[in-house]
Amino acid sequence: MMRGMGNMQSMMKQMKKMQAQMTAEQAALNEQTFTGAAPDDMVKVTFTGDKKMKDITINPDAVDPDDVDMLQDLVVAAVNDALTKVDEQTQSTMGKYTKGLQ
């Protein structure tokens, strides 16, 4: 009977340790920055790991008052590129904790 309690305590310790590691890795991931770019680097955006936009750079050549749609498309492309990078790194870093839980 006591042996089962020891195993339970050990398992709880391991779970707390894993939770602390997961929290630390998530915090580190949130501090990283990810830059996405539109074709020809006409627009670049930078996000943090928790998907907060930090910066946007627009090449002056991308600004054409007669073609606002192109600039909008470039911004969307850059944002999607950056967010894809965030998602890929998040999966790479945090996936080991969720493997088998899906």
Swiss-Prot record:
Q: Which InterPro entries match?
A: YbaB-like_sf, YbaB/EbfC
User: Which positions make up the signal peptide?
Assistant: none
Keywords assigned: Cytoplasm, DNA-binding
Any one GO molecular-function label of the UniProt entry = DNA binding
Q: Where in the cell is it found?
A: Cytoplasm, Nucleoid
- Outline the segment boundaries, as ranges, of region: Disordered: 1-24
Q: Which GO terms describe its cellular component?
A: bacterial nucleoid; cytosol
Q: Which SUPFAM superfamilies match?
A: YbaB-like (SSF82607)
Query: Sorted alphabetically, which PANTHER family does this protein's record hold?
Result: NUCLEOID-ASSOCIATED PROTEIN YBAB
Q: Which family does it belong to?
A: Belongs to the YbaB/EbfC family.
Function noted in UniProt = Binds to DNA and alters its conformation. May be involved in regulation of gene expression, nucleoid organization and DNA protection.
The record's note on quaternary structure and interaction partners says: Homodimer.
**Entry protein name:** Nucleoid-associated protein lp_0699
Say which species the protein is native to: Lactiplantibacillus plantarum (strain ATCC BAA-793 / NCIMB 8826 / WCFS1) (Lactobacillus plantarum)
